[in-house]
């Protein structure tokens, strides 16, 4: 008879033998999450309506025409180019939901919008066509660019949908020099579109949100959304708005317009990319504006000082360059509980990084999985200390040691209480120097 063997849960076996458990050593998963994820709603001439769609920076560069309907260099994509200068991933939302798809005898545009009117169908005879069996080559053009070719097609039902059109299910193919799609329209942007966007955005993770609408009711809506998400839900991000002095660390208020239009909100995408894409150990102070717009920097020294005092994110001119004046948010009401440090976006980046990373760590590794005993709390302490040590290694915080973190049992058997002291590092901004001449 064979000896006993296998694995064990408790030491209650009867037969002699070797009972061996193989368990992976727990790995600390308290790593720093990456930044550079942002979201923004925009009016567009092409693309899916009424829902968020995600675009990576590399996809935008290579496939902008398929995604947005235009070549990468087109003027219509300037807001997208601006935001991708410093963002890696963007959750876009196309505003307007009542657009009409352009169409012709053979095809219907993939999406509603005026860009569909630039599509056209060209049908020529295939080289193998005969009277008994006509064959056609069917081309789809966007402007002057061929975007699809299907050769040797006998019937319209043989055509396969492409990135630009869906073919109609009935009809007869015939030689066509150029048949445009017509009657495509953009949907009218309504205030309710912004609420639809915000409702959908709750399910996504991002570092910054932007809004190019300057209407007071809309900016107030976005500011309230950011405050609710940050303070009530625990989802930490900053929202970039135009001249919205919300007196809140979660709202960045951009003051500058353009030289051609001082009230233009065109800089919002660039700032959104910067706020979301700047590393946790970096500051955007004195960052050079590398976008395509002519920024209005017609401010006096006093106006710049007042802008900082009121909580405005501003640009100013340094020789031939346009630079960020200082990397601040709209918070100005300093209290004993909230010092002036909370007006620094670099400080908020550090605090948001800690909040988001530890929440993810707890949810994935501890929630409902690790017992709330001394060993479990020590494990959580170890992971938090490891996370903060990484922040200190990249000079995002300073003067940190394990003694700054305590993990204790809460008021109930299921709760755990963490007390955490951190000192965020900020970049140098002012130099006070006294030179003694002998």
Regions picked out by a protein language model, each given a short descriptive name:
Residues 406-438:
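C-terminal edge-of-domain segments
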């Amino acid at each position: 008879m064979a000896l006993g063997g296998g694995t064990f849960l408790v030491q209650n076996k009867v037969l002699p033998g070797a009972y061996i458990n193989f368990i992976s050593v727990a790995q600390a998963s308290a790593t720093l999450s990456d930044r550079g994820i942002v979201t923004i709603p925009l009016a567009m001439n092409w693309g899916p309506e009424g829902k968020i769609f995600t675009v990576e920076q590399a996809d935008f560069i290579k496939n902008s025409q398929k995604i947005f309907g235009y070549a990468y260099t087109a003027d219509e994509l300037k807001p997208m180019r601006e935001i991708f200068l410093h963002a890696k991933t963007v959750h876009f939302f196309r505003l307007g939901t009542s657009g009409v798809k352009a169409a012709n005898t053979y095809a219907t545009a993939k999406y509603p919008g005026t860009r569909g009117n630039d599509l056209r169908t060209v049908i020529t005879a295939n080289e193998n066509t005969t009277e008994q069996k006509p064959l056609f080559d069917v081309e789809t053009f966007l402007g002057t660019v061929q975007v699809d070719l299907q050769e040797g097609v006998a019937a319209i039902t043989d055509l396969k949908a492409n990135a630009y059109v869906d073919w109609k299910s009935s009809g007869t193919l015939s030689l066509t020099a150029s048949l445009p799609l017509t009657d495509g329209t953009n949907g009218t942007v309504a205030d309710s579109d912004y609420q639809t966007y915000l409702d959908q955005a709750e399910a996504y993770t991002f570092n910054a949100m932007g809004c190019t609408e300057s209407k007071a009711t809309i900016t107030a809506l976005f500011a309230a959304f950011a405050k609710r998400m940050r303070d009530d839900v625990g989802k930490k991000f900053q929202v970039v708005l135009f001249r919205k002095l919300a007196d809140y660390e979660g709202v960045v208020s951009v003051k500058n317009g353009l030289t051609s239009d001082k009230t233009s909100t065109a800089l919002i995408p660039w700032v959104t990319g910067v706020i979301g894409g700047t590393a946790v150990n970096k500051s955007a102070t004195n960052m050079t504006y590398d976008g395509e717009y002519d920024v209005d920097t017609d401010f006096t020294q006093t106006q710049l000082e007042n802008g900082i005092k009121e909580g405005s994110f501003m640009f100013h001119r340094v020789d031939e360059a346009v630079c960020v004046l200082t990397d601040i948010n709209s918070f100005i009401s300093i209290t004993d509980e909230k010092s002036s440090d909370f007006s620094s976006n670099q400080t908020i980046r550090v605090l948001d990084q800690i909040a988001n990373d530890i929440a993810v760590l707890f949810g994935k590794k501890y929630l409902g999985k690790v017992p709330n005993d001394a060993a479990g709390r020590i494990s959580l302490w170890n992971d938090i200390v490891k996370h903060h040590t990484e922040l200190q290694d990249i000079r995002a915080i300073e003067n940190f040691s394990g003694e700054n973190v305590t993990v204790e049992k809460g008021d109930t058997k299921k709760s755990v209480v963490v007390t955490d002291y951190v000192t965020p590092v900020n970049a140098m901004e002012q130099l006070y120097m006294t030179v003694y001449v002998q």
